[in-house]
Structures are given as structure tokens and as C-alpha cells.
């Protein structure tokens, strides 16, 4: 239960709705009278959910791929930068259109074709990411309290679902206040870990582009994973808000937090922490007082990330054309997604967490890279057009370019370059194989192919 003082602080908003009122807007354009907020708020909105243990552990995965500490830091910084640029740009579209990101996606995919990326986003965000982050939060709570993991999972799920159920205004407030605690705690953690780090260049081998590509792909998959939500949290801003200010605040918030914590993870797993449950191993490298604060931060950070995941995952579900007939259908879908995602976190994530998390991150990049490429090319080609008439409810817009480019590029890139390395299951594309030397070029290939295919189809089908 939230403290009364906190609830009182959240009552006041710049718009007509209170922060604790259940949101009834879903994918319809936000009316001018309900627009509120400032662009700089987006920095904390996108910093807070990244101040969590999953972000730290990506740095560890880059080290496990075969990179030394400096190579790992450069790899994750590059992956984050590539993702943050498009995340910032897509965020800037929200105030103009007033609708969620997956509704804007209709301009390239059409109303029916957009079911494909919207449904994928629902599975990945509302269920997949929810399960992963719930697990890291539950690990922290178990380490902190000695509760059974199942009990910790239940507690984390309930907190997340309640926050996402209430909706946009409450989430904005929660992220803003969580940011201050998380930023202070993880800043201290960063100083401690950096001071204990080993900065030699081991493994003392030649630079491996394959291992480097995996490090970049892991960071890209994580940070780009927020992009299907980009406009969801800017659509309430006044239409006159500066697109540049929106893009910079959102992009920098994403890049700064992810790069800092992934770098801490790379340093930590390059010689500071030992074996064991990831959260326990990480906390054991810290002074006892800081370990307690950090475990609380990991739990809060997982909630901070997942209220965005489950909220926007349900937006994607509704954008796919689901009709429930209830004004509160968004809130209802939050509960459903929480139950399904929570169920997965009980049974599928605790075992082999490292391998499942790595595979999940790479898979996120496999579908996101083509989708992002298609939207980038579409926006460039439609410069000067009235996008709103293509994406609003009731629009008859159709497009074959988006779905074809998406399916073909994803299928070809995965069949050629994808890799899945689990203790019991291995899969390799036609042009890759075991070991870090082969790398993972799936996302890059998918991006280039999707951009080219969509460009050609658009030009052919839009000849005047």
C-alpha cells in the first residue's frame, strides 16, 4: 500500500484527471483539454525503468560473450546509442498525433497489417519483459527477506499490476519519484563497483567482431525494446511541445541510464562479483548497508520497468484491433497480461536465467530492427503528408509494404544469422555457428533488408 503522503502528492496534475484516477483513454487521440506535462519529465520517465538489475546484467552478458571490460562497455554504449536515437525520434511523434506508438505504426502497416507488429509487441512487452523483470525483482526481494521465490514473485506482480491498472498519470508520477531513490542508490553502487574493478584487457586475445556484435545486439535489444512504447508516454503532452525537446529528453534518459548500469555490470562481472544467484552475487560485493539499499532498488526498479511494459503491452493489444466493449478495456487487459506474464515468471524464468535472458534480448532485436526500419523509411517518404488520416480509428488505410517487408526481412535474417544457445537446445542460422566468433548479425541484416524492401514497395505502389 502506498503511503498516504505519497498519494496526496499525486493528486495534483496539470490535466483534468487525477493521478490516482483510473485512466479511461486507451488508443483514441488525447483531447486538447487533457494534454499536460513538460518534455523534460521524459528524462525521468525513461531513466527510472532502466535503473534496474536487468540493465546491469546485460553488461555481464557482454563479458560472458568473450569481451574484456573495455570492449564490453564500448559494445553496450554503441547498442544503446543506436536504439536511443530512434526512441527519441519516435517519442517526438506523440504530441503531434496524440495516440500510442503502435497506432502510429498503422501508417506503414495499414489497419489490418498492423496486427502483426502489435501482437508481437504484446507478447514481448506485456508478457515476455514482464516475466523477466518480475523475476529479477523477486530474486532481490527473496535475497532481502528470505521469502520463498514464489511469494516474492506474487508480491512484485501485485504492485506492478495495481500501478499499471491505474494508468498514465499515476505511472508518470511513480517514475518521477522512483527516479530519485534509484538514481542515488545506483550512483553510489557505481562508485563502489568502479573503485573495485579490474581494468586489464583480458581476455588477452585479438579483438573479435563476432563477440562484439553480440554485445551490441544485447544492448540494442534491451534499449530498443522501449521504442514500441515511445509515443505512449508523450501523447499527453501539448501538441505545441517542441519535438526536439521531447526527442532529446526521451533519448538521453534512455541512453544515460542504460549505458551507466550496463557498464557497471561489465565491470562487476570482470572480477568483482562471484558465482550464485545473480542478485545475491552482485549484492555480496557491496557493503552490507549498501547491499540492502541496492536490493530494495532492484525490486523498485523491476516494478518501475514493468509498469511501463504491462501498460504499453496492453496498448499494443488494443491497437491490434481487439474490441472488448468496455470503457476500461485497457485496465482489464493490464490485469490479464499481468496474470499471464506472472505465470511465466513462476515456471519458465528462474531456471537458466542467464541463457533465457540472453536469448530473449536477441529475439527482441530480431523483430524490432525490421519494424523500426520500416517506420523510419515510411516517415521519411511521407514527409509533408497528413499522417493522422491514415492512423485514426475508422481509417481505411491499407498497406502491403509494411507487412511484406517485416515478414521477409525477419524470416531471412533469422534463418541466416540467428543463434540460440541454451544448455539443452541449440539453433544456428545457415551462416552462423557455435561460439562468439560467429557473432549475431540478425538485427543489422533485418534492418537493412526491411528498409530496402519497404522503400521499393512504397515507390512501386505509390506511383502517381
Give the location of each predicted region.
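Hydrophobic, membrane-embedded alpha-helices of multi-pass small-molecule transporters
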Residues: 39-56, 190-196, 205-268, 288-309, ...
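Loop-to-transmembrane helix boundary motifs in multi-pass membrane proteins
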Residues: 256-257, 320-350, 393-413, 417
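Transmembrane helix-loop boundary segments of multi-pass membrane transporters
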Residues: 63-74, 139-153, 169-178, 279-293, ...
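Transmembrane alpha-helical segments of multi-pass small-molecule transport proteins
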Residues: 115-122, 144-166, 180-191, 219-230, ...
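Membrane-interface "cap" regions at the ends of multi-pass membrane proteins
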Residues: 2-69, 211-216, 235-245, 461-463
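Helix-loop-helix connectors at the membrane interface of multi-pass transporters/channels
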Residues: 102-106, 112, 134-151, 238, ...
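Juxtamembrane transmembrane-helix boundary signature
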Residues: 76-109, 117-124, 455, 459-462
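C-terminal membrane-solvent junction of multi-pass transporters and transport-like membrane proteins
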Residues: 29, 371-453
Amino acid at each position: 500500500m502506498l503511503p498516504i503522503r505519497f498519494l496526496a502528492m499525486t493528486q495534483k496534475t496539470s490535466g483534468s484527471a487525477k493521478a490516482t484516477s483510473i485512466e479511461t483513454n486507451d488508443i483514441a487521440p488525447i483531447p486538447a483539454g487533457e494534454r499536460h506535462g513538460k518534455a523534460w519529465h521524459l528524462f525521468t520517465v525513461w531513466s527510472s525503468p532502466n535503473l534496474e538489475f536487468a540493465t546491469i546484467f546485460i553488461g555481464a552478458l557482454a563479458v560472458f560473450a568473450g569481451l574484456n571490460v573495455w570492449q564490453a562497455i564500448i559494445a553496450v554504449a554503441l547498442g544503446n546509442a543506436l536504439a536511443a536515437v530512434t526512441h527519441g525520434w519516435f517519442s517526438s511523434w506523440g504530441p503531434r498525433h496524440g495516440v500510442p506508438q503502435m497506432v502510429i505504426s498503422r501508417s506503414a502497416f495499414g489497419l489490418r497489417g498492423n496486427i502483426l507488429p502489435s501482437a508481437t509487441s504484446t507478447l514481448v512487452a506485456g508478457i515476455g519483459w514482464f516475466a523477466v523483470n518480475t523475476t529479477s525483482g523477486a530474486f532481490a526481494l527473496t535475497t532481502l527477506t528470505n521469502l520463498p521465490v514464489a511469494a516474492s514473485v506474487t508480491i512484485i506482480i501485485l504492485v506492478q499490476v495495481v500501478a499499471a491498472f491505474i494508468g498514465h498519470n499515476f505511472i508518470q508520477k511513480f517514475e518521477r519519484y522512483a527516479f530519485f531513490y534509484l538514481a542515488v542508490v545506483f550512483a553510489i553502487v557505481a562508485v563502489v563497483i568502479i573503485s573495485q574493478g579490474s581494468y586489464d584487457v583480458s581476455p588477452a586475445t585479438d579483438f573479435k567482431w563476432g563477440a562484439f556484435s553480440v554485445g551490441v545486439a544485447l544492448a540494442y535489444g534491451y534499449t530498443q525494446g522501449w521504442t514500441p512504447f515511445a509515443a505512449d508516454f508523450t501523447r499527453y503532452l501539448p501538441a505545441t511541445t517542441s519535438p526536439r525537446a521531447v526527442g532529446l529528453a526521451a533519448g538521453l534518459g534512455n541512453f544515460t541510464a542504460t549505458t551507466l548500469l550496463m557498464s557497471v555490470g561489465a565491470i562487476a562481472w570482470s572480477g568483482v562479483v562471484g558465482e550464485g544467484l545473480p542478485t545475491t552475487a552482485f549484492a555480496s560485493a557491496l557493503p552490507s548497508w549498501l547491499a540492502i539499499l541496492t536490493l530494495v532498488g532492484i525490486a523498485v526498479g523491476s516494478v518501475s520497468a514493468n509498469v511501463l511494459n504491462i501498460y504499453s503491452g496492453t496498448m499494443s493489444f488494443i491497437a491490434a484491433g481487439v474490441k472488448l466493449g468496455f470503457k476500461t478495456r485497457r485496465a482489464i487487459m493490464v490485469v490479464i497480461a499481468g496474470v499471464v506474464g506472472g505465470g511465466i515468471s513462476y515456471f519458465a524464468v528462474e531456471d537458466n536465467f542467464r541463457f533465457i535472458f540472453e536469448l530473449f534480448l536477441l529475439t527482441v532485436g530480431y523483430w524490432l530492427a525490421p519494424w523500426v526500419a520500416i517506420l523510419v523509411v515510411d516517415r521519411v517518404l511521407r514527409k509533408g503528408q497528413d499522417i493522422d488520416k491514415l492512423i485514426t480509428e475508422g481509417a481505411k488505410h491499407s498497406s502491403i509494404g509494411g507487412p511484406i517487408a517485416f515478414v521477409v526481412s525477419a524470416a531471412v535474417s533469422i534463418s541466416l544469422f540467428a543463434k540460440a544457445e541454451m544448455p539443452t537446445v541449440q539453433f544456428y542460422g545457415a551462416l552462423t555457428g557455435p561460439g562468439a566468433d560467429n557473432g549475431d548479425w540478425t538485427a543489422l541484416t533485418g534492418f537493412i533488408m526491411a528498409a530496402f524492401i519497404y522503400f521499393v514497395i512504397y515507390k512501386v505502389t505509390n506511383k502517381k
